Amino acid sequence: LNIELEAGRAFGSGSHESTAGCLFSLLHLFKIISPKRVMDLGCGSGILSIASVKLWPLAKTLALDIDYDAVKTTLENIKVNKVWRQIRCKHSNGFPRARPGTSKKYDLIVANILAKPLVALAPHSSNFLRSGGHIVLSGLLRTQEREILAVYNSLGFRLVSRKRLKEWTTFILKYKRT
């Protein structure tokens, strides 16, 4: 994937193991799915949003971050990579507020954030992910794997793939509505 990137003050140059794990996971998913709607939760520099639309040019991606600098950096990187038609970027403290009557779900959610927010956001994940959809979780240490898997398994998610790079782990999980 050819991505021009200025990380600025935002996380996500591609060199950190958690970001690299997400990129490996997107390449793995590229072989088996073709999502129409993607959410990048904690977009940082926008690298994962940009990678998703380079892999799936017809996909629409929503990039969200709690940090205003990250949103600004993502918007700049979207322009540099000429993918502004496919990616919307917004400031958000977690998942976006669902508008009444909106039932559009995502086929793929990527969340490269830390374990604690991944646990806190877990119960809301199924509200935004369609049954049969995938979620990529990263930003967690090997020592946190069991806790994260237990929480997501209890909500109907099943492990598809685990990628370990040094002490960092990235999961691909598939959601099945029960």
Regions found by a protein language model. Give the residues of each.
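Nucleotide donor/acceptor-binding cores
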Residues: 1, 35-37, 133
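A short, charged helix-loop
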Residues: 2-7
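Conserved SAM/SAH cofactor-binding pocket of Class I
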Residues: 9-94
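S-adenosylmethionine
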Residues: 59, 66-177
